[in-house]
Amino acid sequence: MNIVVVGLSHKTASVEIREKIAFAPTQMEKPLRMLIAIDDIAEAVIVSTCNRVELYASTRDVAGGMARLKRFLGDYHGVPVEVLEPHLYSHHGEAAIRHVFRVAASLDSMVVGEPQILGQIKTAYGYAAEFRTSGIILNRFLHKAFSVAKRVRTETKIASSAVSVSFAAVELARKIFGDLSDKTVMLIGAGEMCELAAKHFLNNGARGVMVTNRTYERAERLAEEFEGKAIHFEDLFDQLHKADIVLSSTGATHYIIRPKDIDEVIRRRKMKPMFFIDIAVPRDIDPKVNDVENVYLYDMDDLQNVVASNLQQRAEEAKKAEGIIEEEIGQFYKWISSLEVTPTIVALRSKFEDVRRAELEKTLSAWKDLPPDGAKRLEALTAAIVNKLLHPPTATLKRTGQGGRTDLYVDALRTLFDLQTELPEPEGSLELEE
């Protein structure tokens, strides 16, 4: 049995293509059941996120199985396969294992190290387990992927540094203030960058948010989203002393904050430090504000430098993660390679035993002058011959199952001796790790 992967991602397809074949998370039962009804698709899991759509399956026929999965993607969503084909990738065997381990560990994500993808794969597996479309192979496979991702996050620092401008602002604020739990954030502007920064600051423990904008209604909407306070733009300097962290991103064509404005603000704060982040282009804050005592000003270039440094660090950590994944691939492939060894050996022995017994019974029934212990001796003789004949192939099969590829040997024995083998019964769903 082989693991195969067919899918597309942000690396191979535009959002226009990705959205055409996205699966609704609340409607997974139908496509999952349709997948395992396809000839030779034994198990199936569907991963569908904003950045990727992937089908994981187990099948005996690798080429046929992957072709059927591609056809299913097109047919289910009403998109010609010819349209999808240039954007699709497919993997099997070790390559499929490597791909899924890398995806789960966030090495294939748009932002390397982001944690969301692991939760999304767990959710996808949860649907497959609920509708019983995963079995012994994909159960073991995905739980191994979860443990590999956990090991990567534990043994590397791949997710420990900011790789977005908004989160870099939080990282710098923590370097200045340490604990943010008693710090108030003032947002000057109500655009997407301010909103994202507010989320990061609050997720990292900031006490509260104030929002000001030239259009007061927009400030109100954003403040309401974060249970904060909206400030009229003309009241900015009357309220600024209440903020420990100020993030500015407006469309102004001139400085809206100058050193003389901050001199009075810092006095009202009794010289308590203030942290200004100017992510506007053109800049909102006069660079000379940084000369005011106890004021720390960072602009977009400063933040980009932090991001660039952290991206380099993540790249180094990603190399460590790749090493962990290669190690884990070897261990898992040994298991999946040996999965069909025992049933094949059992079937081979059973085949030989059936022949031995049939021929022995014919001989015994035709032998009229058989000595009293003749039947017993012939039984032992024929059993010994069968054991001698079967010892080399079964020993070789066991040996390859412990440390190498077995598909060649298993397939050869099945073909040569017309063996019918079955995998163990699916073990059902496994409890998801936290």
UniProtKB/Swiss-Prot annotation:
| Reaction(s) catalysed by this chain's protein | (S)-4-amino-5-oxopentanoate + tRNA(Glu) + NADP(+) = L-glutamyl-tRNA(Glu) + NADPH + H(+)
One Pfam annotation, family name?
A: GlutR_N
Query: So where does NADP(+) get bound?
Result: G189, A190, G191, E192, M193, C194
Q: Which Gene3D superfamilies match?
A: Glutamyl-tRNA reductase, N-terminal domain, NAD(P)-binding Rossmann-like Domain
| Tagged with keyword Ribonucleoprotein | no
Q: Which residues are annotated as active site?
A: C50
Question: Which residues are listed under the site Important for activity?
Answer: H99
Q: Which GO terms describe its biological process?
A: protoporphyrinogen IX biosynthetic process from glutamate
Pathway annotation: Porphyrin-containing compound metabolism; protoporphyrin-IX biosynthesis; 5-aminolevulinate from L-glutamyl-tRNA(Glu): step 1/2
**Record InterPro entries:** 4pyrrol_synth_GluRdtase, 4pyrrol_synth_GluRdtase_dimer, 4pyrrol_synth_GluRdtase_N, GluRdtase_CS, GluRdtase_dimer_dom_sf, GluRdtase_N_sf, NAD(P)-bd_dom_sf, Shikm_DH/Glu-tRNA_Rdtase
The record's keywords, sorted A to Z, are: NADP, Oxidoreductase, Porphyrin biosynthesis
The Swiss-Prot or TrEMBL record annotates one GO molecular function as: glutamyl-tRNA reductase activity
User: What Enzyme Commission number(s) does the record list for this chain?
Assistant: 1.2.1.70
Q: Which protein family is it in? A: Belongs to the glutamyl-tRNA reductase family.
According to its UniProt entry, the function of this protein is described as: Catalyzes the NADPH-dependent reduction of glutamyl-tRNA(Glu) to glutamate 1-semialdehyde (GSA).
Q: Cite any additional comment in the entry.
A: During catalysis, the active site Cys acts as a nucleophile attacking the alpha-carbonyl group of tRNA-bound glutamate with the formation of a thioester intermediate between enzyme and glutamate, and the concomitant release of tRNA(Glu). The thioester intermediate is finally reduced by direct hydride transfer from NADPH, to form the product GSA.
Give the comment on domains. Possesses an unusual extended V-shaped dimeric structure with each monomer consisting of three distinct domains arranged along a curved 'spinal' alpha-helix. The N-terminal catalytic domain specifically recognizes the glutamate moiety of the substrate. The second domain is the NADPH-binding domain, and the third C-terminal domain is responsible for dimerization.
Subunit structure of this chain's protein: Homodimer.
What name has this protein been given in UniProt?
Glutamyl-tRNA reductase
Which gene codes for it? hemA
